[in-house]
Amino acid sequence: TSGSRQTLITGEACRRACAELKKAMAGRPLSDLNGTEYYGEYLAKTDPLGADVPNPVSHVAYGYATQLCVVGEDGKIERMVAAHDVGRAVNPTSCEGQIEGGVVMSMGFALTEDYPLKDCRPTAKFGTLGLFKADQIPDIKAIVVEKPGLDVACGAIGIGEITSIPTAPAIADAYFRYDGKRRCSLPLEGTPYSRVKK
């Protein structure tokens, strides 16, 4: 998956507008530019699906991630470790929060959440869907990996949906190592988090 489109696209457009402002300010006080507007534009060019070109570009930037799940002797998750490449972290604290939020969201997807539908309509109330409560969330170690990124947006790739992608596989593999049972559907069955189906 890609990083945050807004961080990359809007960030580069903003950087370009700021470069124009900086150029206009050369040797002048800011008050001389009162009322002047500066614009920046950035279009991230990608190739269409099925393009007959060598090495087609489907995303402008990619983020990479790895996650680890630690299951205790009682079968409950003790800790999640999530390392995510963000290029340059514009706001490291926000990146950590995004990682933690994605992990919690995907933990629910992997272990407890069930959204039953009948004829495309929900058959359960929101409060019964199995969302994790704050006191049920294990320790989450969020690792923001900064590495040189693109030459746009000051190297920021951003972070988005990728925070929730590796979580369920990490949890499934942790349970496989725990009890030797391969689980291939979500929510995972036969864990301390499993709910009795009605």
Locations of the language-model features?
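C-terminal catalytic domains of large/alpha subunits in multi-subunit enzymes
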Residues: 1-198
